[in-house]
Amino acid sequence: MEKDVEIGIFGGTGIYDSGLLEDAKEVDIDTPYGKPSDTITVGTFKGRKIAFLPRHGKKHTIPPHMINFKANIWAFKELGVTRIIAPSAVGSLKEELAPGHFVLPTQFLDFTKSRDGSFSEDGRVIHISVADPFCPELQSSITEVTDSLDMNIHKDCTYVCIEGPRFSTKAESKFYRTTGADIIGMTLVPECQLAREAQICYASISTVTDYDVWAEKPVTAKEVLETLSKNVEGTKKILTELIEKIPKDRSCSCAKALEEAEF
């Protein structure tokens, strides 16, 4: 099995293939938590070893509440991944975050209900810190890239994660707005906190597809896909520039996340 992969990319809604990888091959991994969402594509790009996994499966057959997040993170860890970039589709909770805009979340609010969000089991108790859930080093690299590309990306935003797969009611959407959160989606949690437990750096690049339902126009899956199809090239452009900007050595604290987390 490959053990020297540096960077893992989780494909979100609208991004189902790696596209940019050279010498790509499919890797099938079994984990203690079952199978990942699909086979993992491993290849190289600009001299960096990359693993790509669409979290919904290559044919988008896995709804958000049924994603095997633990298997996905474990599989990346098995390959040697130390950094994860996670594109995703989100709804906007604020008028200034318009469809087509990119968002760099720095905090989350967890409204999921039935997801297994920890590797803490079999007598191992982990109280991981997610005070700052995302790797500052990765976020800095993303900001550097989007600034150089003159792309409109909103920073310091809070992501509301809901269970799905249904969209919110109008009452729920208006409630989430009262929390001060900026965007809403279905996949960030527990993905980011499992990455922290695995001591893997993690950052999300979110694409706004709609105004949820607070704006009185109900969101539809068709609307989400139409917006994503227009913006997928923007996401790929960010990834293309980002991969070579990520430092080879880590200077963040993500690699030491368990040192003060276990009893």
Swiss-Prot record:
Substrate binds at residues 186, 210-212. Its EC number is 2.4.2.28. It is an enzyme of class 2 (transferase). Coiled coil: none annotated. Pathway: Amino-acid biosynthesis; L-methionine biosynthesis via salvage pathway; S-methyl-5-thio-alpha-D-ribose 1-phosphate from S-methyl-5'-thioadenosine (phosphorylase route): step 1/1. One of its GO terms (cellular component) is cytosol. Transmembrane segments: none annotated. One of its GO terms (biological process) is purine ribonucleoside salvage. The keyword Cell membrane does not apply. Disulfide bonds: none annotated. NCBIfam families: MTAP, PRK08564.1. This is S-methyl-5'-thioadenosine phosphorylase. It comes from Nitrosopumilus maritimus (strain SCM1). The gene is mtnP.
